[in-house]
C-alpha cells in the first residue's frame, strides 16, 4: 500500500538549532533562556507574557510545528539542581513536533506558587484540551480560557493535586478509607452526565436528543472507558469521552522507585506491549548516564520488541474483526499469539510482562535453542496472515462496515497528536524506526506500510502489513545476531559480572550500594520516544542527582487517539463508532497510566 500524497520527511538532526535561530530573529535572544539537556531537542524557557505569541509563531512558521506532542508540568519546589534556570515553583512544558522538519522543540514557562495561571492554547492545537485538564488535575495550574477545565484522571470529587511534591505517594499516609452511604451517593451523583456543562442541548428544533452511556463496562469500549453519546435516533450529534477509570498514578510511582525498580511498572502502561514499554524508559535512563550498550543488546531488544508488536497486532486483528460481527478469527489470532508467547517465554521467562530489559542491557543472554524457536515462528506466521487477508479482511461485510468510516486526513491527524498506524493510514510516512532510528533500526531492511484513505479499514490493513515487516526484522535478527556481552560494562548498570565481584572489593561495594539504594544518575533531563505498538510512546525523565527520578513523564499514544474521537465520529451512526473504536487499537492502561 502506498500513498500518492505523502509528506517528504527530511533526515533527522538531533538538537536542531535552526528553530532557535528563527525564534531569536523574531523575538530576540534575550526572550529565551536555553537549557542544556540530554533530550535531543532545543529546550527554551520563555516568560509567561510571551508564551502564547511564541507558540503561535511556531505553529505558523514555515514547515510548522503542527503537532503538540506533549504538554505537562513539573513541581520544581524540591529540585536542588537548577543552576542557570529561571526561578520557579512550578513549570509547564510544551513539546512541539514538526513532521516536515523532522525535529522537535520544547518551550518551558516558570510559575510561582501564588500565581499558577497560564493562557490556554486550545485555539492553537485542539489536543491541548486534555493535556491542560490533566495539568490542572495533577498540579492545580489554571488555564484561562479553557473550554472545560475539569478533572480528567481523578474523580470529580477528588481533593488535592497528586503530582505535587507535598501530596502523599503512599496510601498509608492517608487516613483509613471508609465509604459511607452519603459519600457513595455523592460519588454516584458526580458521575451523572450534565449536557449543559458540556455545551450540549437536550432538545433540537424538532427533536429530543437521547444521551446514551457507552461504557465504562461495555465490551466494545475495550476497557474501563465511558463515552457519552448525544443521539438523534442512531445518528451521533456529539459525544464526550470520559477516561481515568484505569488511572494508577504511574508517574507518581516513578518518584519513589529506584531507576531499576521502576522497570516492571513500565510493563503495565500498555499491558499488551510487554518489553516494548521497557525500551523508551531504559533508553532514556541510558542517555542520562551516558551508557553505550553492546551491539548484541540492540539486536536482542529489537527482536523482542518486534515480537510484542506482532502479539499486540494479532490481538487487535482478532478483536477488531469480532467487533464488526465475525467471531471465528479471534480464536485463530489468539492461537498464533500463543506461538509467539512460547518464543517470548523461552527467551525472557515470562509472557505478557517480562520486565526483561535492563539499564545497560537485558536480564540474561539468549538461551540455548532460541534460534530454532524463532525460525519456526518466522516461517509460520506469513502463511497465517495470508489466510486472514483472504478469509476475513476481504470479506464484503467487513469492508462495508469499515471502508469510508471514521476517516480523517494527515492535517487532522497531526493537529490531534495522532501517531502510529492511525497517522500512516492517512499517507504520512512517519515511522520513528525510519525517521529517527534508535537502537540500531537503521541497520535493518524493512518497509513502512502506508494507506491513503485514513479510514477504519486502512488502519487495520496498515497493521497487518506491519506484522509482515516485523517478521522481516525478526528474521534479520535471527540471521545476524552478534556475538558478545548482553549488558554494558558500566558502573551504573547492575549487576556487574560475578567474577569481578569475587576479585575486586570496590566492585562488590558498588554492587551492594546499587542493589540496596539504587544507582545514582547525574542531574539532568533526558527524553526518548519510540515507535511502539499503538503509536509513539516516550519517557521524559528529570534527575536531580539521586537514586530515584525527580519527575517521570510518560506520554502514551492512546491518550490523544481517544481525545480525537468526537471530531471524527460526529454525524456517523452508533454502529460506525463501534468500528472506529476497534480501529484505534487502544487499551485503557495506556490511556490512563
Swiss-Prot record:
Its main location: membrane. It is a peripheral membrane protein. InterPro entries: NADH_DH_suC, NADH_DH_suCD, NADH_Q_OxRdtase_suD, NADH_quin_OxRdtase_su_C/D-like, NADH_UbQ_OxRdtase_30kDa_su, NADH_UbQ_OxRdtase_49kDa_CS, NDH1_su_D/H, NiFe-Hase_large. Keywords: Cell inner membrane, Cell membrane, Membrane, Multifunctional enzyme, NAD, Quinone, Translocase, Transport, Ubiquinone. One of its GO terms (molecular function) is NAD binding. NDH-1 shuttles electrons from NADH, via FMN and iron-sulfur (Fe-S) centers, to quinones in the respiratory chain. The immediate electron acceptor for the enzyme in this species is believed to be ubiquinone. Couples the redox reaction to proton translocation (for every two electrons transferred, four hydrogen ions are translocated across the cytoplasmic membrane), and thus conserves the redox energy in a proton gradient. This is NADH-quinone oxidoreductase subunit C/D. It comes from Pseudomonas entomophila (strain L48). The lineage of its organism: Bacteria, Pseudomonadati, Pseudomonadota, Gammaproteobacteria, Pseudomonadales.
Amino acid at each position: 500500500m502506498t500513498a500518492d500524497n505523502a509528506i517528504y520527511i527530511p533526515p533527522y538532526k538531533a538538537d536542531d538549532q535552526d528553530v532557535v535561530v528563527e525564534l531569536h530573529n523574531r523575538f530576540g535572544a534575550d526572550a529565551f533562556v536555553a537549557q542544556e539537556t540530554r533530550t535531543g531537542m532545543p529546550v527554551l524557557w520563555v516568560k509567561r507574557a510571551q508564551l502564547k505569541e511564541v507558540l503561535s509563531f511556531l505553529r505558523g512558521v514555515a514547515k510548522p510545528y503542527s503537532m503538540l506532542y506533549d504538554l505537562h508540568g513539573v513541581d520544581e519546589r524540591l529540585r536542588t539542581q537548577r543552576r542557570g534556570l529561571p526561578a520557579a515553583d512550578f513549570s509547564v512544558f510544551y513539546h512541539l513536533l514538526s513532521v516536515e522538519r523532522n525535529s522537535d522543540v520544547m518551550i518551558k514557562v516558570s510559575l510561582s506558587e501564588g500565581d499558577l495561571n497560564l493562557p490556554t492554547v486550545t485555539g492553537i492545537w485542539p489536543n491541548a484540551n486534555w493535556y491542560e485538564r490533566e495539568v490542572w488535575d495533577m498540579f492545580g495550574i489554571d488555564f484561562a480560557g479553557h473550554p472545560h477545565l475539569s478533572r480528567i484522571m481523578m474523580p470529580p470529587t477528588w481533593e488535592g493535586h497528586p503530582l505535587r511534591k507535598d501530596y502523599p505517594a503512599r496510601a498509608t499516609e492517608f487516613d483509613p478509607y471508609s465509604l459511607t452511604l452519603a459519600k457513595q451517593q455523592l460519588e454516584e451523583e458526580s458521575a451523572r452526565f450534565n449536557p449543559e456543562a458540556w455545551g450540549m442541548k437536550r432538545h433540537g428544533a424538532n427533536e429530543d436528543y437521547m444521551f446514551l452511556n457507552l461504557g465504562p463496562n461495555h465490551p466494545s469500549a475495550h476497557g474501563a472507558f465511558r463515552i457519552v453519546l448525544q443521539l438523534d435516533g442512531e445518528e451521533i450529534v456529539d459525544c464526550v469521552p470520559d477516561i481515568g477509570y484505569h488511572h494508577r498514578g504511574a508517574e507518581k510511582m516513578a518518584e519513589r522507585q529506584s531507576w531499576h525498580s521502576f522497570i516492571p511498572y513500565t510493563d503495565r502502561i500498555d499491558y499488551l506491549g510487554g518489553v516494548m514499554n521497557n525500551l523508551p524508559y531504559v533508553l532514556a535512563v541510558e542517555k542520562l548516564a551516558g551508557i553505550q550498550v553492546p551491539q548484541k543488546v540492540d539486536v536482542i531488544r529489537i527482536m523482542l520488541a518486534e515480537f510484542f508488536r506482532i502479539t499486540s497486532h494479532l490481538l487487535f486483528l482478532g478483536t477488531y474483526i469480532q467487533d464488526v460481527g465475525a467471531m471465528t478469527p479471534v480464536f485463530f489470532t489468539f492461537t498464533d499469539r500463543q506461538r509467539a508467547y512460547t518464543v517470548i517465554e523461552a527467551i525472557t521467562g515470562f509472557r505478557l510482562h517480562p520486565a526483561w530489559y535492563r539499564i545497560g542491557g537485558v536480564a540474561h543472554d539468549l538461551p540455548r535453542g532460541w534460534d530454532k524457536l524463532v525460525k519456526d515462528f518466522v516461517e509460520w506466521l506469513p502463511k497465517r496472515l495470508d489466510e486472514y487477508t483472504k478469509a476475513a479482511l476481504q470479506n464484503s461485510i467487513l469492508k462495508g462496515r469499515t471502508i469510508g468510516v471514521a476517516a480523517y486526513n494527515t492535517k487532522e491527524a497531526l493537529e490531534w497528536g495522532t501517531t502510529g498506524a492511525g497517522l500512516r493510514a492517512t499517507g504520512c510516512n512517519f515511522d520513528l524506526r525510519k525517521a529517527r532510528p534508535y537502537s540500531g533500526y537503521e541497520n535493518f531492511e524493512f518497509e513502512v506500510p502506508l494507506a491513503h484513505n485514513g479510514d477504519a479499514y486502512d488502519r487495520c490493513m496498515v497493521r497487518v502489513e506491519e506484522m509482515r515487516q516485523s517478521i522481516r526484522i525478526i528474521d534479520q535478527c535471527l540471521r545476524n545476531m552478534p556475538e558478545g556481552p548482553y549488558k554494558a560494562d558500566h558502573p551504573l548498570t547492575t549487576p556487574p559480572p560475578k567474577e569481578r565481584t569475587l576479585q575486586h572489593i570496590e566492585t562488590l561495594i558498588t554492587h551492594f550500594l546499587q542493589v540496596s539504594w539504587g544507582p545514582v544518575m547525574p542531574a539532568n533531563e533526558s527524553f526518548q520516544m519510540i515507535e511502539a505498538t499503538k503509536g509513539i510512546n516516550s519517557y521524559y525523565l528529570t534527575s536531580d542527582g539521586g537514586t530515584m527520578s525527580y519527575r517521570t513523564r510518560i506520554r502514551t499514544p492512546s491518550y490523544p487517539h481517544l481525545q480525537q474521537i468526537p471530531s471524527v465520529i460526529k454525524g456517523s451512526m452508533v454502529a460506525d463508532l463501534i468500528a472506529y473504536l476497534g480501529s484505534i487499537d487502544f487499551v485503557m492502561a495506556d490511556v490512563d497510566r
